[in-house]
Amino acid sequence: MTENKNFEFIENEIKNNKVVLFMKGTKEATMCGFSAKVVAILNKLGVEFRDINVFVNPEFREDLKKFSDWPTFPQLYIKGELVGGCDIATELYNNGELEKMLKG
């Protein structure tokens, strides 16, 4: 089934990359302000991250929402765990927690 292949891909990406951002567009060409904001935060922190464009495949985008149980994008994963979207990433950045999570 395609869903299983998508879930397998997602699991593989978050397992094999310390930081993954499922986003609208790419880090070089963001396609929404929320994705751009998270990219800017990660860049300010000097973090290398894997970016995955959710616009490439509508079925993948829907499967990712099911996988994460999170309805919106971007979705930031650190060390295999969903951190959240733009608002949560921004809040964690502003209070210093995001940097701690990334260094730990």
Curated annotation (Swiss-Prot):
Keywords: 2Fe-2S, Iron, Iron-sulfur, Metal-binding, Redox-active center
Domain Glutaredoxin: start-end pairs: 7-104
Residues the record lists as binding [2Fe-2S] cluster: C32
Matches recorded under InterPro entries: Glutaredoxin, GRX_PICOT-like, Monothiol_GRX, Monothiol_GRX-rel, Thioredoxin-like_sf
Highest taxon in the source lineage: Bacteria
Matches recorded under CDD domains: GRX_PICOT_like (cd03028)
An example molecular function term from Gene Ontology annotations: disulfide oxidoreductase activity
Annotated residues for binding of glutathione: K24, R61, F73, C86, D87
Family from the record: Belongs to the glutaredoxin family. Monothiol subfamily.
Alphabetized PANTHER family for the sequence: GLUTAREDOXIN FAMILY MEMBER (PTHR10293), GLUTAREDOXIN-RELATED PROTEIN 5, MITOCHONDRIAL (PTHR10293:SF16)
Protein name: Probable monothiol glutaredoxin 2
Gene source species: Rickettsia felis (strain ATCC VR-1525 / URRWXCal2) (Rickettsia azadi)
Lineage: Bacteria, Pseudomonadati, Pseudomonadota, Alphaproteobacteria, Rickettsiales
